[in-house]
UniProtKB/Swiss-Prot annotation:
Keywords: Phosphoprotein, Stress response. The gene is Hsp26. PANTHER family: HEAT SHOCK PROTEIN 22-RELATED, HEAT SHOCK PROTEIN HSP-12.2-RELATED. GO terms for biological process: chaperone-mediated protein folding; cold acclimation; determination of adult lifespan; protein refolding; response to heat. This is Heat shock protein 26. It holds the Pfam family HSP20. Residues 191-208 have a biased composition (Basic and acidic residues). It comes from the Eukaryota. Coiled coil: none annotated. GO terms for molecular function: myosin binding; unfolded protein binding. Residues 187-208 are annotated as: Disordered.
Amino acid sequence: MSLSTLLSLVDELQEPRSPIYELGLGLHPHSRYVLPLGTQQRRSINGCPCASPICPSSPAGQVLALRREMANRNDIHWPATAHVGKDGFQVCMDVAQFKPSELNVKVVDDSILVEGKHEERQDDHGHIMRHFVRRYKVPDGYKAEQVVSQLSSDGVLTVSIPKPQAVEDKSKERIIQIQQVGPAHLNVKANESEVKGKENGAPNGKDK
């Protein structure tokens, strides 16, 4: 391999690229905001005037094309990525190959299941059927009933759980409301009169 070809390969491998290529690939939440340099004109050492970040005819471009081709196979399983940060639990994945009606997100016990499936359809290389299932465990302290999911217009599915609120240590204290009533001395005098009457043997009924 010549020196110019080697330098070209190193230069091209350092170019940023979009992370949204593979089927159901787990993405870090911040990766959604990384955009490719698709329109930036790059220099070429080997004389290939290519406007894309990685020239398709270069060795790096051929490797990238092979990786994309492998991503369309059903037997490829990419590692899932879950992120727990200050905003809570979050999972992002590329599902651009699926329609919204072909995606399903559900909670089973303490796990989140994400499934995508479409029947056999024709593409540029023939017919293909895609299907993937991913399972994520709900972190300790998080509530499974608060799981929400969003699908962006560019095909990124985000499943998240808000961060649990801190539980305040409240003592078992209860404020008793004071009720305002009439004068208390009237009730006391009435009770004393009844007691004295019983001590003197006052008849309770009629004399015969």
